Amino acid sequence: MRMILMFDMPTDTAEERKAYRKFRKFLLSEGFIMHQFSVYSKLLLNNSANTAMIARLKENNPKKGNITLLTVTEKQFARMIYLNGERDTSIANSDSRLVFLGEAFPDET
C-alpha cells in the first residue's frame, strides 16, 4: 500500500520557513518520495506500518498548516497518470524495492 501525503504550510516568516524545512526533512528521513512540491508518497508494507506512520506524523505535525493523508493499494497507485512535458523518468511509480548496502556507488566518469 502507498500513503500519499499532501500538505500546505505558510512560509511568510523565517520561523514558518524553518518549520517547513524541518517537516520536509522529517518526511525525507521517513522514506517519503516527493512527487510535487507539497505531494509526497511512501511505500508501506501493511496496515500496522500505516498506523505507525500516522502516529509519527501526528508527533511531528507542524503547528501551522494542513496535512492530508490518503492510503491506496499498489494497484491503484500504479494506475496514477503522470502528465509532464518530458519523457517520464520517475522512479516513484515503481513498486520495486531497492536496498543499498555499504558505501555509495562511485561516480562514473
Swiss-Prot record:
Signal peptide: none annotated. GO terms for biological process: defense response to virus; maintenance of CRISPR repeat elements. The keyword Metal-binding applies. Its cofactor is Mg(2+). InterPro entries: CRISPR_associated_Cas2, Virulence_VapD/CRISPR_Cas2. Its EC number is 3.1.-.-. Keywords: Antiviral defense, Endonuclease, Hydrolase, Magnesium, Metal-binding, Nuclease. Mg(2+) binds at residue 8. GO terms for molecular function: metal ion binding; RNA endonuclease activity. Homodimer, forms a heterotetramer with a Cas1 homodimer. CRISPR (clustered regularly interspaced short palindromic repeat), is an adaptive immune system that provides protection against mobile genetic elements (viruses, transposable elements and conjugative plasmids). CRISPR clusters contain sequences complementary to antecedent mobile elements and target invading nucleic acids. CRISPR clusters are transcribed and processed into CRISPR RNA (crRNA). Functions as a ssRNA-specific endoribonuclease. Involved in the integration of spacer DNA into the CRISPR cassette. Belongs to the CRISPR-associated endoribonuclease Cas2 protein family. This is CRISPR-associated endoribonuclease Cas2.
